[in-house]
Amino acid sequence: MVHICRLFVVMGMLLCLSAQFASSQHWSHGWYPGGKREIDVYDSSEVSGEIKLCEAGKCSYLRPQGRNILKTILLDAIIRDSQKRK
């Protein structure tokens, strides 16, 4: 009986942890269920400076970062390894 209780506790903890890491849609900021979005027409005066920079191709957060991930991980590992040796 004790093993079954422990099993249920562990399964409950795993369920809670997996819910934290699961991807789900956040229904705010104009999004509605079904993937529908509220359509608003913005005036040109409401366009922020960041959007203007993105239209010019200067926004860093829209650039693909996939190629540099492995390089960054390897460099961090090398730096940590060299710091441990000192």
Curated annotation (Swiss-Prot):
Keywords: Amidation, Cleavage on pair of basic residues, Hormone, Pyrrolidone carboxylic acid, Secreted, Signal. Belongs to the GnRH family. Stimulates the secretion of gonadotropins. PANTHER family: GONADOLIBERIN (PTHR10522), PROGONADOLIBERIN (PTHR10522:SF8). It is found in: Secreted. Its main location: secreted. Residues 1-24 form the signal peptide. This is Progonadoliberin IIA. The modification Pyrrolidone carboxylic acid is found at Q25. The keyword Transferase does not apply. Olfactory bulbs, hypothalamus and telencephalon, midbrain and posterior brain areas. GO terms for molecular function: gonadotropin hormone-releasing hormone activity; gonadotropin-releasing hormone receptor binding. The lineage of its organism: Eukaryota, Metazoa, Chordata, Craniata, Vertebrata. The modification Glycine amide is found at G34. It comes from the Eukaryota. GO terms for cellular component: extracellular space. The keyword Signal applies. It comes from Carassius auratus.
